[in-house]
């Protein structure tokens, strides 16, 4: 058996958009995720009622043209087109959802991106579709789903590297951090932890650091 960090899937995309977004692009982004599987989820969060309505119409138009229409149609049953009152609310909802893929199609997408703390992979601007991340832009598309982006990152080289830490404390260093270690150990009532430092500090005070 091989341990893994988490199950990946079902797949998700969220488009975070304002009134400047192109509904044709947004609909295409939602459908590109919906065709993955019947349990995929595609979410639009927008501050614009007009955009929401335009995207709804465009999704129906593009859906009718897809070879995987039946799959995408079932996926859309799990999906939502959400209108919020402000961009601040949209960002708060996004961070709570922690989408696997997040596409930001707003006028000030860079400043919006700075406020995103939970997402697997973020696609910036109207010309950056999620499918670019799947195939060509170089980012890994094995990403946390189902809210796990709050705690995990996507697969990277770090995922396959085993790391060992090494530390050495010199006399000056022990004199600096030793009292803090003693205080913390005493607070946890771990006297042996404290003593491991205290005996060394005592030796240093007596001029014997060995």
Outline where the language-model segments fall.
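Conserved NAD(P)+-binding/catalytic subdomain of aldehyde/semialdehyde dehydrogenases
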Residues: 1-41
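Flexible, glycine/charged-enriched surface loops at secondary-structure junctions
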Residues: 3, 40-45, 65-75, 105-106, ...
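Electropositive phosphate-/nucleotide-binding environments in soluble metabolic enzymes
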Residues: 7, 20-28, 45, 49-53, ...
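General beta-strand structural signal in soluble alpha/beta enzymes
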Residues: 4-6, 15, 26, 83-84, ...
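A glycine- and small/hydrophobic-rich beta-loop-beta segment
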Residues: 36, 44-119
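C-terminal core of ALDH-fold dehydrogenases
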Residues: 95-209
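Gly/Ser/Thr-rich active-site loops/lids in small-molecule metabolic enzymes
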Residues: 6-12, 38-45, 49-57, 67, ...
